[in-house]
Amino acid sequence: MTEYALLFVSILLVNNFVLVKFLGLCPFMGVSKKLETAIGMGMATTFVMTLGSMFSWLINEFILVPLDILYLRTMAFILVLAVVVQFSEMFVRKVSPELYRLLGIFLPLITTNCAVLGVVLLNINLSHGFLQSTIYGFGGAAGFSLVMVLFAAIRERLAVSDIPAPFRGSSIALITAGLMSLAFMGFTGLVKF
């Protein structure tokens, strides 16, 4: 049980996909201008990364490995993620049309989010079991969501701040992301996993 908790904390804080592995930077920068959009994108990404990790592990273990067609891993995983994203897109459209409108093109682009594909490929490369893959996917998604929501809250405050003209927009956003990354480096000694 402790191993699973350490895995979750490790991927959530210490090995965060956005701030440490630099995966998922496109939605991180693109959707984080408003807090409500970041929360919605975080929930959708959490759903996709968790289910994608589960289904990809099952497909790898019960189809790709037994049939010795490992060269189709990436293609199979992208297909699984596309199906999960389409399901989540239909769900968000039905439950919250306003959130669906706010997320716009970023919702279907979850399929090509490198953090989503990265968690699936890292699960296979790290030889995780089913439960570990699920925890790794959920922890990675929770870390992605946490960082995106924190970043969106900071960006909303920066939008009303008096920032010198050369630093407005993407410049201050990248500086802020760098400072967040430095802050998360403080968690490095927390988990030795």
Curated annotation (Swiss-Prot):
Keywords: Cell inner membrane, Cell membrane, Electron transport, Membrane, Translocase, Transmembrane, Transmembrane helix, Transport. Part of a membrane-bound complex that couples electron transfer with translocation of ions across the membrane. This is Ion-translocating oxidoreductase complex subunit A. It comes from the Bacteria. GO terms for cellular component: plasma membrane. NCBIfam families: PRK05151.1, rnfA. It comes from Pectobacterium atrosepticum (strain SCRI 1043 / ATCC BAA-672). Belongs to the NqrDE/RnfAE family. It is found in: Cell inner membrane. PANTHER family: INTEGRAL MEMBRANE PROTEIN OF SOXR-REDUCING COMPLEX (PTHR30335), ION-TRANSLOCATING OXIDOREDUCTASE COMPLEX SUBUNIT A (PTHR30335:SF0). The keyword Electron transport applies. The chain crosses the membrane at residues 5-25, 39-59, 62-82, 102-122, 134-154, 171-191. The keyword Lyase does not apply. The complex is composed of six subunits: RnfA, RnfB, RnfC, RnfD, RnfE and RnfG. It is a multi-pass membrane protein. It is an enzyme of class 7 (translocase). Its EC number is 7.-.-.-. GO terms for biological process: electron transport chain. InterPro entries: Ion_transpt_RnfA/RsxA, NqrDE/RnfAE, NqrDE/RnfAE_oxidrdctase.
